[in-house]
Amino acid sequence: MKTTLLSAILFTFCLLSCTNDDGGDFGKDTPRYDIPLSTKSGEINTQVQRFSFDFYREIAKTEKDKENFCISPLSASLCLGMILNGADGNTYTEMQKTLGFEGFTNQQINEYVQMMQTELPKLDGRTIFTNANSLWVRNGFPLLPEFIQTNQTYYNAEVSNEPFDNSTVEKINSWCNQKTNGLIPEIINNIPDKAVSYLINAIYFKGLWKNEFKESDTKDETFYLASGGIVRVPTMRQTQSNNYYADEDVQVIELPYGNGALAWSFSSQPTVRKKISIK
């Protein structure tokens, strides 16, 4: 398992949608439901949030020349959490430190993950949240039954040894196609000779705004680029009372979905040219 850890290739998907084209009960109003957290679970949750911002900052350093990028820190923490169940020694210590999980047992971490994966989809009938995990390992690197059972039980992960030939490429792509509702039909076209394992997480979120934007209110507005340039872009607008925070370094506004249990927080660095218009 240690060799696998050193050669793991990690894929994460975060698919977002704010439209209503699903059947079933999606879009049905439901009372707000908040996840009850024990003291330990609350502490772990705080560390997951800390890791999310740390992870974003590190990725932003390497992607700073790109116009846009999208990451899912939750996906990364789930994949690393699965690996943590098979790590020991210095590898385990360093992973715990990176994730902020020092002082917590694997059992406490696993129970937190299991609870969140079970409870998050229940929060709001006007949102859909699905999460899928899988671990694919090359034949010749047998996995301990306890490791497989743990990740199946707490992460609901599909774990298997594979020949890592074209048939494995097809299996992985088929899994991705299924778990992303056909939005990502293919993620790899070959497997490198030195690849030993693939850890894949797919998170899908679909939500309806609590206060929906009217298409008729969208207007072209001036947008100031970080480079100093100016462009005109279609800009959604509405007048609502929402949670808002600002200081010298950042402005943050929270836009709730459905019953308010989930929300999207937008942040922006304030400039002398343009600030979020708050009334």
Identify the function of each model-found stretch:
Residues K66, I109-P270, K275-S277:
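Non-catalytic, conformational "gating/processing" segments within enzyme and secreted inhibitor domains
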Residues T3-S7, L16-F164:
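Detector for small/aliphatic-rich hydrophobic stretches
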